[in-house]
Amino acid sequence: MAAKSKNIQVVGRHIVNGVRSRAVAYGLFTSRNDHTSAYDKNVEEELQPSQVPDEMIKPDSDKYWSPHPQTGVFGPSSSSTNAKDEFRGGQEDSVMEEKAWFRPTSLEDLDKTHHS
């Protein structure tokens, strides 16, 4: 009889422990969903898209930006190019025309021979 009641107690403990572990697991699962972080996006702080009124946009603007012929830098295009810029551009040497010297990397790994 004592063995039978002992078995009932063991089975009862397993059932109670299973219910407790499910409750704890459920509690952990719900707390993960409620987690907030300082890095979360705040919807109210987002910038809302705005439209530019048509009066502000000029359809036939005479000031377009284009690349400079020598430098390639974009800026407001001008109908007359500066003569000084053209003269100076012709005088300067191109970077492509400069000589470059390269040291072979294979020399760094060689052992120096000592002549005696």
Swiss-Prot record:
Transmembrane segments: none annotated. Pfam families: LEA_3b. Residues 55-65, 83-101 have a biased composition (Basic and acidic residues). Disulfide bonds: none annotated. Residues 37-116 are annotated as: Disordered. It comes from the Eukaryota. InterPro entries: At5g17165-like (IPR039291). Belongs to the LEA type 3 family. This is Late embryogenesis abundant protein At5g17165. The lineage of its organism: Eukaryota, Viridiplantae, Streptophyta, Embryophyta, Tracheophyta.
